[in-house]
């Protein structure tokens, strides 16, 4: 499993995977690692293979595992993936054209939507790449989702994101105040990704005039050890210049 690589278009990182559990994310990335560069061909997994790829440790019956797999696609279908093309048309789509789970055969068969196979096929630039085993070893769903975004900027070692986008991308409850974001979101991220990537999280504040109260949290800068990729180009950074004043 150590050789399995997940690779997809950076556009996939713009989609928040709402209500996905840590196991849901592991299964989705395991599937993504195998359908990559297969075009729209059907790809079949045995349950045992999929469990191994996802690093699943708990014991589950075939029926339980089939329901877990089906839940992943239900959540994908509920998301309404969308992006804008060069003509600025807003296009919504389902990622998989076929997603067949068979408890009796103990198999999953999937095929990627033909119109949007570009997300997982023939990627030469502007893509996110990481090791599946490293991803599945993470425990927190917040750490997993942050990890994916950091890997988009693996050559620069910096991800800048506004508070608004951070909430959306990591599906942070709207009710969370900064103190709760620190405790329930950033703490597991720092605990797991700090040692792994030498991650440092810098909080960005909008300074107010004297006597106008405390500065407001407006974003984050995630700094980590960049990867060295021979002949590669660095990924673009997110511009926070309009909303962040250090």
Where are these regions (language model features)?
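Charged, alpha-helix-forming regions
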Residues: 1-246
């Amino acid at each position: 499993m150590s050789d399995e690589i997940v690779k997809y278009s950076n556009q996939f990182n713009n989609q928040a995977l709402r209500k996905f559990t840590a196991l849901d994310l592991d299964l989705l990335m395991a599937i993504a690692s195998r359908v990559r560069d297969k075009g729209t061909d059907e790809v079949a997994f045995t349950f045992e293979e999929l469990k191994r790829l996802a690093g699943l440790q708990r014991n589950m019956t075939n029926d339980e595992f089939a329901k877990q797999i089906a839940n992943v696609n239900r959540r994908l279908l509920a998301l309404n993936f969308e992006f804008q093309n060069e003509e600025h048309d807003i296009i919504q789509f389902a990622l998989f054209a076929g997603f067949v789970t068979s408890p009796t055969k103990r198999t999953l068969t999937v095929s990627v939507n033909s119109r949007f196979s570009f997300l997982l096929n023939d990627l030469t630039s502007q893509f996110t790449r990481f090791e599946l085993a490293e991803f599945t070893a993470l425990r927190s769903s917040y750490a997993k989702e942050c990890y994916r975004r950091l890997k988009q900027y693996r050559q620069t070692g910096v991800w800048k994101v506004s508070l608004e986008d951070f909430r959306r991308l990591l599906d942070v409850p709207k009710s969370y105040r900064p103190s709760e974001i620190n405790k329930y979101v950033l703490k597991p991220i720092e605990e797991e990704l700090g040692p792994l990537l030498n991650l440092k999280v810098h909080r960005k504040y909008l300074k107010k005039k004297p006597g106008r109260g405390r500065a407001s949290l407006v974003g984050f800068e995630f700094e980590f050890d960049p990867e060295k990729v021979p002949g590669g180009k660095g990924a673009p950074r997110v511009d926070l210049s309009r909303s962040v004043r250090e």
